[in-house]
């Protein structure tokens, strides 16, 4: 019967498929949002309070989507001492398009050349900020399919989020996240628990192939985001209730059943409103809400219709106040990267996940269910969940993934603050040069973090060449931004059961390596 699974299907799947490791990269400089308010001549607090943003990361003409992804992939491989031959699938989610034919993934294959591993499935996936999640789902589906050969899948989500001068510019940011997907993971995907909503909308789109800037309908974009959240949460609740009923539990799912709830974050204030929105959904879905003390003071809103409340300030204010404690418990910590670095488009929601893992101990995380809402304009959205393993012992997979992110706040703090006029000059430089051929970037590489890949030149045929900023000292990534040689014989994360011969380990590539995507 269509839609049914055989009784023994569970035995066919690899155990505990999920996120084995996570690496995040953001540029080495940022602009302070309070200073940007002054520079833009707007009221104090418009960006810092109204949007909830403190700092915004940005990159110079030395970085593009290829270099961002090269950096985050190599850092993940080095930090965990993984061999490049243990990757069997590599997919990139991005909306930062610099070539309408050649994928970012194909550029990343340069990192795999020394290993000799070219047997790697996957390409790029694009739909605004949703591409990273689509790539994650494809990776999970591959590991759970007959195509799986026993190796890891690697997902890269990355973007450069920049806007023309005006109200939208302070909602920008830059970043990339790499996710290692495989079995026996500390963060396990809840099978069968995805609530998805797809719809045609012109809320945010990029029709001008010569511009990095989007066309944005701000009001429609907020409505689309919140309505998609309503739809996805409704579907998710129905699916988990059906699962619970099969297990003999007769109860409705609410926000309290999530240990953490993270969101795609265009700006932090929208996330706080979104958590309140889910609380409103719980309120309207509760047949006994008049008897539930958590809804005390909200009785006047019992007859509202969701579709009439997107811009109802009374509803918004009341439910943000009523859900403030839930927000502090389940969501606030996830906004570290968003608040300090800004919107990273496809990698935004996974930056939120990194923020949670960086600020809680394995013992605090163990056994929790993490709700994840991913949204991409146009539109595509899914609410799904991860279940954190119960094993929080020293040396466990959960202990390793949290330890690998313990330097996140110090990395954010180590960046350089740049004056708003310098930020504006960099934006103008990108605007004038990002599409040029026969171009040598003008900005210095000295401001880049050590180990960052950067653009060396674009030749007359638009072929791009990259190099990696060398390390001044050979010290571990666990101690800061130093080098751990890739392709070492001993992996910190055990590879899945190999179904293919393992290629010999190769030496780490030279710090002065230069790679290109074309012959010169």
From Swiss-Prot:
Its subcellular locations are: Cytoplasm
Swiss-Prot/TrEMBL GO biological process terms: acetyl-CoA metabolic process; cholesterol biosynthetic process; farnesyl diphosphate biosynthetic process, mevalonate pathway
Report the catalytic activity: acetoacetyl-CoA + acetyl-CoA + H2O = (3S)-3-hydroxy-3-methylglutaryl-CoA + CoA + H(+)
Q: Which sequence positions carry the modification called N6-acetyllysine?
A: 46, 273
Q: What's an example of a GO molecular-function annotation for this chain?
A: hydroxymethylglutaryl-CoA synthase activity
**Quaternary structure annotation from Swiss-Prot or TrEMBL:** Homodimer.
Q: Which NCBIfam families match?
A: HMG-CoA-S_euk
Name of protein: Hydroxymethylglutaryl-CoA synthase, cytoplasmic
Source organism (scientific name): Mus musculus
Q: What is the lineage of its organism?
A: Eukaryota, Metazoa, Chordata, Craniata, Vertebrata
């Amino acid at each position: 019967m269509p839609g049914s699974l055989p009784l023994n299907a569970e035995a066919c799947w690899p155990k505990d498929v999920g996120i084995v490791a996570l690496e995040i990269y953001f540029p080495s400089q940022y602009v302070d949002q309070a200073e940007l308010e002054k520079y833009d001549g707007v009221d104090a607090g418009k960006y810092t309070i109204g949007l909830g943003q403190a700092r915004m990361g940005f990159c110079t003409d030395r970085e593009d989507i290829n270099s961002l992804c090269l950096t985050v992939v190599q850092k993940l491989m080095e930090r965990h001492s993984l061999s490049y031959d243990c990757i069997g699938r590599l997919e990139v989610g991005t909306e930062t398009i610099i070539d309408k034919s050649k994928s970012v993934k194909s550029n990343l294959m340069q990192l795999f050349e020394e290993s000799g591993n070219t047997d790697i499935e996957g390409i790029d996936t694009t739909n605004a900020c949703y591409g990273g999640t689509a790539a994650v789902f494809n990776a999970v589906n591959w590991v759970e399919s007959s195509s799986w050969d026993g190796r890891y899948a690697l997902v890269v989500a990355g973007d450069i989020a920049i806007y023309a001068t005006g109200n939208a510019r302070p909602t920008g940011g830059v970043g990339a996240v790499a996710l290692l997907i495989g079995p026996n993971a500390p963060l396990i995907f809840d099978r069968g628990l995805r609530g998805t909503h797809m719809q045609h909308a012109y809320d945010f789109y990029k029709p001008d192939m010569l511009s990095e800037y989007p066309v944005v309908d701000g009001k429609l974009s907020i409505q689309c985001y919140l309505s998609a959240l309503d739809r996805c949460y409704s579907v998710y609740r129905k699916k988990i209730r059906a699962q619970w009923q099969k297990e003999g539990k007769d109860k409705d799912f609410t926000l309290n059943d999530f240990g953490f709830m993270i969101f795609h974050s265009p700006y932090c204030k929208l996330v706080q409103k979104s958590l309140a929105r889910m609380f409103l959904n719980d309120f309207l879905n509760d047949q006994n809400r008049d008897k539930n003390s958590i809804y005390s003071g909200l009785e006047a809103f019992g007859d509202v219709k969701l579709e009439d409340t997107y811009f109802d300030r009374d509803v918004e204010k009341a439910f943000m106040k009523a859900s403030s404690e839930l927000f502090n418990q389940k969501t606030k910590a996830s906004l570290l990267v968003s608040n300090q670095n800004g919107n990273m488009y496809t990698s935004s929601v996974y930056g939120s996940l990194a923020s949670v893992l960086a600020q809680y101990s394995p013992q605090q995380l163990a056994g929790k269910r993490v709700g994840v809402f991913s949204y991409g304009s146009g539109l595509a959205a899914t609410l799904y969940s991860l279940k954190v393993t119960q094993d929080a012992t020293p040396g466990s997979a959960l202990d390793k993934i949290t330890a690998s992110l313990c330097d996140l706040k110090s990395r954010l703090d180590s960046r350089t603050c740049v004056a708003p006029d310098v930020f504006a000059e960099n934006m103008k430089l990108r605007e004038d040069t990002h599409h040029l051929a026969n171009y040598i970037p003008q900005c210095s590489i000295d401001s880049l973090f050590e180990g960052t890949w950067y653009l060396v030149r674009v030749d007359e045929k638009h072929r791009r060449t990259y190099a990696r900023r060398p390390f001044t000292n050979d010290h571990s990534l666990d101690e800061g931004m130093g080098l751990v040689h890739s392709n070492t014989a001993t992996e910190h994360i055990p590879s899945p059961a190999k179904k293919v011969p393992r290629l010999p380990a190769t030496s780490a590539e030279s710090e002065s390596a230069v790679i290109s995507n074309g012959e010169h």
